[in-house]
Amino acid sequence: MTHVEVVATIAPQLSIEETLIQKINHRIDAIDVLELRIDQIENVTVDQVAEMITKLKVMQDSFKLLVTYRTKLQGGYGQFTNDSYLNLISDLANINGIDMIDIEWQADIDIEKHQRIITHLQQYNKEVVISHHNFESTPPLDELQFIFFKMQKFNPEYVKLAVMPHNKNDVLNLLQAMSTFSDTMDCKVVGISMSKLGLISRTAQGVFGGALTYGCIGVPQAPGQIDVTDLKAQVTLY
């Protein structure tokens, strides 16, 4: 069983309001990583992100900061072109205070360009979470294992795979793929079976070798998320 860090996802509009800071402070003991989603901000810029990070840095000693731009292709709001998306991810390396950066994986990516960006982020001491999301279904077990394998070839700190289950076997396949991968690879693994059906993957993440589990602060930012206070309490049971 692995140690699991609880990630709290927030998705502010343009700025970090005092009410949001209060909500974070109220849950501070349950948060190991704060994920700042930025894809909900139309035409978001590095300067806007830097301003938000500055406001969050006041509390940063309590948790690590992860920045994520989730594209529409993988279930988010982001509508940047692929080049604009990758340029933004690369430029985030210059922002002090960011500890972790999410970069998406697709089967048709430019492998060399992706590797250059990941290496660039790591040179600026950013931990990389390479992720893939399927909000429609859960692929077969061998395909799940193949996706984990392809993502870890970039030598990130974390590989994250989130899929949508339609039955209990889908949940079991995701957990099996994560468990097998965590036993054989060096990087940390995250496996999420979304929706209420897959809640066990969030609460028992560590049992199957997972390193991060994602919750929310009030309003869920993904199917199946529960409040981080409840999530932390559940995770500590395993």
UniProtKB/Swiss-Prot annotation:
Q: What are the recorded Gene Ontology BP terms?
A: 3,4-dihydroxybenzoate biosynthetic process; amino acid biosynthetic process; aromatic amino acid family biosynthetic process; chorismate biosynthetic process
Q: What class does this enzyme belong to in the EC scheme?
A: lyase
Q: In which pathway is this protein known to take part?
A: Metabolic intermediate biosynthesis; chorismate biosynthesis; chorismate from D-erythrose 4-phosphate and phosphoenolpyruvate: step 3/7
A Pfam family that the UniProt record links to this protein? DHquinase_I
Keyword Acetylation applies:
no
Query: Catalytic site residues?
Result: 133 (proton donor/acceptor), 160 (schiff-base intermediate with substrate)
Reactions performed catalytically: 3-dehydroquinate = 3-dehydroshikimate + H2O
Query: Keywords, A to Z?
Result: Amino-acid biosynthesis, Aromatic amino acid biosynthesis, Lyase, Schiff base
What job does the chain carry out?
Involved in the third step of the chorismate pathway, which leads to the biosynthesis of aromatic amino acids. Catalyzes the cis-dehydration of 3-dehydroquinate (DHQ) and introduces the first double bond of the aromatic ring to yield 3-dehydroshikimate.
Q: Which family does it belong to?
A: Belongs to the type-I 3-dehydroquinase family.
Q: How does it assemble?
A: Homodimer.
Q: Which HAMAP family does the record associate with it?
A: AroD (MF_00214)
Instruction: State what protein this is by name.
Output: 3-dehydroquinate dehydratase
What lineage is on file?
Bacteria, Bacillati, Bacillota, Bacilli, Bacillales
